[in-house]
């Protein structure tokens, strides 16, 4: 199995967690190329006028992963608690992508106001990834530790 990760939006914040998580489960990862004019042009073919350039680039990254992986990771962060809602265009991106493109997506939604934590959302992937919930939970916790170590090292 191969998971595609678009190199956009929250990628640079979460990449260490995601890469460690999938590596610990023995799952191959393919990351889209760095953003170029072509990436944005590809994304513009599937976007509307109200979408910001970041979302257009993100769509381009997803398009570039078509045919290179079994599933594309499409995170959705609705909020981190009260008064922290993200952009409505961003929140709807998962649905736009899955309706416009022929891809299989792995999605998770963080919404602390709805008690949807990252860990709970990762556990939902067990059937897709063909791993037990115990394996998912262990890989998630170890990946969180890995990501924290990397962030600490970068801060020093």
Role assignments for model-derived ranges:
Residues 1-156:
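An N-terminal assembly and electron-transfer interface module characteristic of large anaerobic redox
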């Amino acid at each position: 199995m191969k998971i595609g990760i678009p190199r956009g939006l929250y990628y640079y914040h979460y990449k260490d967690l995601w890469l460690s998580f999938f590596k610990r489960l023995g799952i191959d990862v393919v990351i889209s190329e760095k953003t170029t004019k072509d990436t944005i042009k590809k994304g513009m073919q599937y976007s509307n006028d109200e979408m910001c350039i970041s979302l257009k680039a993100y769509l381009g990254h997803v398009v570039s992963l078509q045919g290179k992986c079994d599933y594309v990771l499409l995170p959705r962060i609705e909020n981190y608690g009260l008064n922290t809602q993200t952009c409505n265009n961003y929140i709807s991106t998962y649905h736009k992508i899955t309706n416009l493109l022929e891809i299989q997506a792995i999605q998770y939604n963080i919404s602390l106001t709805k008690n949807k934590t990252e860990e709970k959302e990762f556990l939902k992937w067990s059937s897709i990834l063909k791993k037990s919930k115990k394996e998912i939970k262990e890989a998630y916790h170890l990946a969180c530790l890995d990501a924290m170590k990397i962030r600490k090292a970068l801060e020093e």
